[in-house]
A protein has these predicted regions:
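Acyl activation and transfer enzymes in specialized metabolism, enriched
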Residues: 42-59, 146-192, 231, 249-253
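Active-site-proximal acidic secondary-structure segment that organizes catalysis
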Residues: 26-83
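Short beta-strand or tight-loop elements
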Residues: 21-27, 276, 297-299, 306
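Acyl-thioester-dependent condensation/acyltransferase catalytic cores
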Residues: 1-42, 49-52, 114, 150-156
C-alpha cells in the first residue's frame, strides 16, 4: 500500500470503538511503512491510559529493547497502579482535605459568574440565550452528539519551537501556561476584546515518581478562568495564569464533577451548558530519543483523531 492508503487505514482504525464486555481496551499493531519506516500503531481507551502514561510506557519499551540487544541497564520497575490508586482514595476520604478543596473553589466562584466565549464569536452564546429563553444567560450549550472528531496538524519549525522554549526558561513559565495565554488572547480577540475568558485545562496529576510511572489515566480537567485587562502585557497574562494554575495544582485530586456541580449550583446553569469554549491538554513529546543507543534512529510520531 502507499503511504496515503496506510494513513487512511490507521485513521479508520482510530474511529472504531472497543467492545466493552470482557475485551481489551487497546490495539497494538506493528506497521511497516514506505521509506523504511517501521513502528507501532497504538490505540488505547482513555479510561485506562493517558498520554503521559503512554510516553512512559514507550520509553520503557525502548529501554527494554536496548537492554536485551545491547546489554544496557533495564528500566526501573514502575510503581503499582493499584497501590497509587488506593493512596488516591485514602486522600479523597480525608474530610479536612475535601473541605480545603471545596473552600478553594468556593473562593474562586465568589468572584462572580464567568461568561462563555467562542472562537466563532458570540453567535453560540446568543443562540443558547434564545433556546433557553434567558436573555442574560452567560453559559452556552455543550455539543454532546455527534462525538466524531477531526484533527488539523500544525508543525512548528524547530527554530520557532526553540524560541518558545527559551522564552519559557527566561521567564520561568511553562509551555502549557504560554499556550493557555495564546488561546485566551485569540478568544478575547474573537469576542470584541472580552477580558473574561474561561478555558478548560487538563491536569496530569503526576508530580511524584509513583504517580509518574504507575501508568493508567490520571488526568483531571478543571476550568481555567482568566480576567486579563487590555493594558496588561502578554507576560503579565501568563504570570496571572501561572498563579491561578498553581492554586489548582494544590487541589488537583478534587473530583472535577464536584467542581462542575459547584458551578451549576452557584450560578444556576441550565443542564449541559458550559462557560469554556476551548480546552487544552499539553503533553509534549520528544522529537528524538534520549537513549544513546537509539540516537542514530530518526523518530516520527503521528496523532490520529478518534
Amino acid at each position: 500500500k502507499s503511504a496515503p492508503e496506510i494513513k487512511a487505514l490507521m485513521n479508520h482504525w482510530s474511529t472504531l470503538g472497543f467492545d466493552e464486555a470482557d475485551s481489551p481496551l487497546l490495539r497494538f499493531v506493528m506497521v511497516s511503512l514506505p521509506g523504511g519506516w517501521n513502528g507501532l500503531y497504538l490505540c488505547i481507551d482513555h479510561r485506562i491510559m493517558d498520554s503521559c502514561g503512554l510516553i512512559f510506557m514507550m520509553n520503557d519499551t525502548f529501554q527494554l529493547y536496548c537492554h536485551y540487544l545491547y546489554g544496557s541497564p533495564a528500566p526501573d520497575m514502575p510503581a503499582c497502579y493499584e497501590e497509587v490508586l488506593q493512596s488516591d482514595l485514602r486522600r479523597e476520604q480525608d474530610p479536612l482535605r475535601r473541605e480545603r478543596d471545596s473552600a478553594f473553589w468556593r473562593q474562586l466562584l465568589s468572584a462572580g459568574e464567568p461568561i462563555y466565549t467562542d472562537i466563532g464569536g458570540s453567535r453560540k452564546l446568543m443562540q443558547s440565550r434564545i433556546s433557553h429563553g434567558l436573555p442574560g444567560l452567560r453559559a452556552a450549550d455543550r455539543i454532546i452528539q455527534p462525538m466524531d472528531g477531526d484533527m488539523e496538524k500544525f508543525t512548528l519549525p524547530k527554530k520557532e519551537a526553540a524560541r518558545l522554549e527559551a522564552y519559557c526558561r527566561k521567564h520561568s513559565v511553562s509551555m502549557a501556561n504560554l499556550l493557555l495565554m495564546a488561546m485566551r488572547t485569540a478568544l478575547s480577540f474573537a469576542n470584541d476584546g472580552e477580558p473574561d475568558i474561561s478555558l478548560r485545562n487538563y491536569v496530569s496529576r503526576r508530580a511524584s515518581r509513583q504517580s509518574r510511572t504507575c501508568g493508567g489515566c490520571r488526568i483531571h480537567c478543571y476550568p481555567c478562568r482568566t480576567v486579563v485587562l487590555p493594558d496588561a502585557t502578554f507576560l503579565d497574562g501568563i504570570r496571572q495564569i501561572k498563579a491561578y494554575q498553581n492554586g489548582i495544582y494544590r487541589h488537583a485530586d478534587f473530583d472535577p464533577e464536584q467542581v462542575n456541580a459547584l458551578f451549576a449550583d452557584t450560578f444556576g446553569m441550565p443542564p449541559l451548558t458550559t462557560y469554556e469554549g476551548a480546552a487544552l491538554t499539553c503533553q509534549p513529546l520528544p522529537l528524538s530519543s534520549p537513549n544513546p543507543f537509539l540516537k542514530h534512529i530518526p523518530l516520527n510520531i503521528e496523532w490520529f483523531s478518534s
